[in-house]
Each structure stands twice: as C-alpha cells, then as structure tokens.
C-alpha cells in the first residue's frame, strides 16, 4: 500500500502552513485523494513530485518516506556532491548513498545527471586506486553493488511518481510473474 500524508503532514514536511497545503490541494496544484469522510490525502509520490517541482526545502524528509541521513535544511553544494558520494561508497554506507541520491533527485538532478556526474566521478576515483591499493577491487565491487541497489531503489520510487501508461501496465504486470509448469 502506498503511503499517504494528511495536509498537515505535507505542510510540516516542506515547511508551509496547513492552510497553504489545503489551498494547493483544492486548487488542483497538488493531486489528492479524498477519504469517504472528505479528508484530503496526498500520496507520498505526489508530495515528492511537488516538492521537486517547486524546489522546496524538505524540512521533515521522514514524513515523505525519505532518508533522514542526508536530506535536511541544507542544500548539497554542487562541488561536494561527488566527494560525499565517493566517501559513502568507499566506506560502504548504503543509507548515506540512498540519502544523497534522494537529496539530489529532490533538488532537481535527473538520474542521468547523477550517473554522468557524482556516480561517474566516484566510480572513476575508486577504480583508479588499483593496483596501489589491493583492497580497491573489493571496494569497487561493493561500491558497484551499492550504486545498483540505490538506483534500483530510486527506479521503484520513480515508478510511483510516474506509473507506466495503461497499455503497458498489463505487459509489465504479466512480465513480472513467473510460473512453473
């Protein structure tokens, strides 16, 4: 089941007033679902889409289901993105890798830009440590696994934000089920 937020949770997550959140929902700028009782519910994926679109500072990432490890009130400086990712990958800190990539995505960086920028820089730096550092092969393999896991996590996250069109849904659903005969 997909996580939903009340208007007060959404407002707290991005640091706006609850009345502003209700106005956004009522004006259609924010896609919502209404409960049988008439309460506005905002899918977490929609809250993330909106925060990214307006480049909002995410004050409470935990309310959006995001990592609290890196995302916070401070934007990530462009120069430090690659270095922070390199450190997280080298030290094997998966939660920090996820948090950094989530923070980059929320700030408007595309997956392609992440791969061509900070991920490429980090993987090149890790790969160039060999043959001087014999541990570098292990570190490179672990970093590759962490990147694949983090990007896989982000792709599942993006699937919520941008579900496949109806004509592909049945194909996608059927291709994911395996049966033994």
Identify the role of each PLM range.
Residues 1-20:
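Polyanion-binding surface elements
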Residues 3, 16, 96, 121, ...:
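Residue-level preference for nonpolar/small residues embedded in alpha-helices
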Residues 8, 72, 170-174:
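Short, contiguous strand/loop micro-motifs
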Residues 12, 91, 174-178:
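Residue-level marker of alpha-helix boundaries and capping positions
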Residues 20, 29, 33, 37-160:
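Long amphipathic alpha-helical segments
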Residues 24:
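Residues in the recognition helix of alpha-helical DNA-binding motifs
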Residues 156-181:
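Conserved mid-sequence domains
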